[in-house]
Amino acid sequence: TFAVFGEVEANQRDYNVAAVSDGFSRDSDGQRYRAGIDFGSTGQIVRGEMSIGYGNQNPSDAGLSDVDGVLIDANVAWRLSDPTTLRFIARTDIFDTNTTGSAGVLSRTIGLEARHAFRRYVIATAGIAYTDQDYDNVPINESELRASLLLEYYLNRDWTLFGQWETIDFDSNQPGNSWTANDVRVGARWRQ
């Protein structure tokens, strides 16, 4: 299957108080315009959707400038074989910030994930993603590199045992704001 789509989104963000950092209200109105393609179905080798567009967020406070940029989004799965799938993701959006003098952040993420079923009940997933955050109107740039490994053992339809490791390397051009973290989780999940 193959389909072309267009998407228009509007938002209104209202906050009860102004930001403590600079006294400006972060209330805003925003729009997102996207055009893209949707292709494939569950049984096909390649399936997913991709879009490109434009987004803007207009603060109600005249002391802050508009935040806008090109939006690129994708979620594409490629089934290499019955037990193995690669997934490519890309996301772009505008987020609020209370950073002094900035109305928002243009955030861009790109990632790759591999999923392999060793058996029907043993599945491993490895992923890596990079995020760049560009602050509007201030010289702050931040990036994040995230890698993860997940192993799942399905006991039955309801219970899953899992082990997960994730590392995050956060980098900022602001002194003292860079950090690295590792997270290990082991547990059981119940779904019904």
Language model: regions and residue ranges:
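Transmembrane beta-strands of outer-membrane beta-barrel pores
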Residues: 10-14, 41-43, 52-58, 90-96, ...
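Residues on the lipid-exposed face of transmembrane beta-strands in outer-membrane beta-barrel proteins
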Residues: 35-39, 74-78, 112-116, 149-153, ...
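Alpha-helical scaffold segments of alpha-solenoid architecture
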Residues: 37, 46-49, 59-63, 68-101, ...
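Acidic, glycine-rich loop-and-beta core segments that form the ion-binding/anion-interacting portion
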Residues: 9-73
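Repeated loop/turn-to-beta-strand initiation elements of outer-membrane beta-barrel proteins
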Residues: 1-6, 43-50, 82-88, 120-126, ...
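C-terminal structural cap/anchor segments
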Residues: 84-135, 142-144
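Outer-membrane beta-barrel "beta-signal"
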Residues: 151-154, 158-160, 164, 180-192
